[in-house]
UniProtKB/Swiss-Prot annotation:
It is found in: Cytoplasm. It comes from Actinobacillus pleuropneumoniae serotype 5b (strain L20). Monomer. One of its GO terms (cellular component) is cytosol. Its main location: cytoplasm. Residues 142-374 form the Radical SAM core domain. Keywords: 4Fe-4S, Cytoplasm, Iron, Iron-sulfur, Metal-binding, S-adenosyl-L-methionine, Transferase, tRNA processing. Catalyzes the methylthiolation of N6-(dimethylallyl)adenosine (i(6)A), leading to the formation of 2-methylthio-N6-(dimethylallyl)adenosine (ms(2)i(6)A) at position 37 in tRNAs that read codons beginning with uridine. One of its GO terms (molecular function) is 4 iron, 4 sulfur cluster binding. [4Fe-4S] cluster 2 binds at C156, C160, C163. This is tRNA-2-methylthio-N(6)-dimethylallyladenosine synthase. Gene3D superfamilies: Methylthiotransferase, N-terminal domain (3.40.50.12160), tm_1862 like domain (3.80.30.20). Residues 377-440 form the TRAM domain. [4Fe-4S] cluster 1 binds at C11, C48, C82.
Amino acid sequence: MAKLHITTWGCQMNEYDSSKMADLLNSTHGLELTDKPEEADVLLLNTCSIREKAQEKVFSQLGRWKNWKKDKPDLIIGVGGCVASQEGEHIRDRAPFVDIVFGPQTLHRLPEMINKIRGGDRAIVDISFPEIEKFDRLPEPRAEGPTAFVSIMEGCNKYCSFCVVPYTRGEEVSRPVDDVLFEIAQLAEQGVREVNLLGQNVNAYRGETFDGGICTFAELLRLVAAIDGIDRVRYTTSHPIEFTDDIIEVYRDTPELVSFLHLPIQSGADRVLTMMKRNHTALEYKAIIRKLREVRPNIQISSDFIVGFPGETAEDFEQTMKVIEQVNFDMSFSFIYSARPGTPAADLPDDISEEEKKERLARLQQRINHQAMQFSRAMLGTEQRVLVEGPSKKDIMELTGRTENNRIVNFQGTPDMIGKFVDIKITDVYTNSLRGDVVRTEDEMGLRVVESAASVIARTRKEDDLGVGKYVVNL
């Protein structure tokens, strides 16, 4: 059987895209996924352009693959993702042995591209933005464990001054609500218990309904939570300026929506936020968190931070540290600023020394780690509901799973617990994990109800006396 290898860099959207590529090429060409690139007949590199020197990293990887192509002339090499979208034809200028260059919105065309290359075409570059077409061309979802990612939209319209996403993934396009619900219901039938809704800015979701109406993100959350078998709902990533009160109301009355939120602020200084074109202040961000904690007192918050943005003063950084303490973030993805070509911020003078940037990043991460450990220690002696993912990586005789607030818990259990929920009493707290004992199995919780995907769609559609279809969100 012919084999496929995909090297994936970057965000969860890229991970999701790579899984779809693998499923697609397995269904169309029978390609079997391998983690050994030297065995592959098709090599795909799914790239990310967020970090500094992303392009050089791509060409370095391609240089290693070039040698394999010399020994294996029929080997097909493709480059996708955000660097491909940015660079386009320039990739082949520097690496003419690359056969296919495709963007995040054209991965569904891979089967046709491969056929053309095998048919004698020299090379194909397709980095267009055909809106939502790719989701209509992908195979049915295939569950791999009790958790799954589902893309609900693509692109971003916010144009933050440091970010390449609007240029590499295009503007915001939402999937129709029926398509999203049907995919999740199919996954639930396969045993998925937790779904993570993906998008560059999920709270901008505006999905078309079957009758031409619009479903908001808050309404979508309620509909997803109503699917039997889905007992946890997460999402990533969201933007503060569209974190509206109707979303906060979902936290008030939808227990399936986890008490853990990733809401990036990037900086705690209003002056820096203005230069970043974030279009909100630190006070407005804190107001959202205050409202959330009024309806979910135990919710834990994570964020992204960019340290050393051009023009960030020592006082600006201290304001960020103050916000970190005030919000009491549980976790963060923190980076030293690096200019991305083509973004407005790339034209700003990079006036902060590398030494100063590293010192600020170390202070920020130390503070967040301290707060995270305080949250973990507070869990000692409590009961936590854990979704069991499989054997522990450290000890195959033990099981591992995650709490609602994203903590890894290791414990002694039986194989029949995998894919189900258990209640664990936390007995030990470590830097990167927790440990505990099982106090309750899922059989004692009465959680799971099996329901077909088609019936979920039927339940979300109702017709009035005149036969006009409408959605009923509060099921």
